[in-house]
Amino acid sequence: MSQADLLAQDPVFQLKGSMLAITVMELAHNDLDRLDAQLTEKVAQAPAFFSNTPLVLALDKLPEGEGELNLAELMAVCRRHGLRTLAIRASREGDIAAAEAMDLPVLPPSGARERLLDPAPKKVEEKPAEPEHKPSRIVTSPVRGGQQVYAQGGDLIVLAPVSAGAELLADGNIHVYAPMRGRALAGIKGNTKARIFCQQMGAEMLSIAGHYKVAEDLRRDPLWGDAVHVSLSGDVLNITRL
């Protein structure tokens, strides 16, 4: 076999699954001027968070009566504030057509999958399958800036300090029995019952099921630096003393 044949068989790429933390911006109104002003305030509070942040624009909750959305201008507003649009979530034909014209991926609207999967009435009652139980992932060494630790299908327990710039991800709960200065994202697949437990809250960001608070918000909390328990109530993160 010649060298050219060997090179032809040598793979030049691999497709790998990856769990990425991506911010979803859910628009409630088609008002780009107000959006620009409110984003300016948010960026002033947390400039590091708005630095080349990947974004999904959720347009499926926009009221029908507010007119056609200028998607290109919306993306330009986001770009000016450091938000990089990767895809949109939409149901209106105009929004979908605009995205396709820009070669921008379109995700199904929130709840569409659940509606499609509504089962027909069953003649025979079936016992639901037992959920697969995965053991907690336990980390005993410090998690340093730039590192990412993910507990798939379960809880993440960290027994050492978490530095600024580090990221903890879990499908379930996150426990940090040491100073917590990085990011903690629990329930990343939508588990709204997930919790975060910190022995010393000094985090850059705390998030449960996509609802988050950044350091600028957390520092104003009277429990900053204390042992806390974080839970989700509706769309609001509740922080209480442990």
UniProtKB/Swiss-Prot annotation:
Which stretches does UniProt call biased (Basic and acidic residues)? 120-135
Q: Per the record's keyword annotation, is Cell cycle included, yes or no? A: yes
Keywords assigned: Cell cycle, Cell division, Septation
GO biological process annotation, one example: cell morphogenesis
Give the region (Disordered) as residue ranges. Answer: 120-144
The UniProt entry's sequence similarity note says: Belongs to the MinC family.
Biological function: Cell division inhibitor that blocks the formation of polar Z ring septums. Rapidly oscillates between the poles of the cell to destabilize FtsZ filaments that have formed before they mature into polar Z rings. Prevents FtsZ polymerization.
The record's subunit annotation is: Interacts with MinD and FtsZ.
Q: Which NCBIfam families match?
A: minC (TIGR01222)
The name on file for this protein is Probable septum site-determining protein MinC
Name its species: Ectopseudomonas mendocina (strain ymp) (Pseudomonas mendocina)
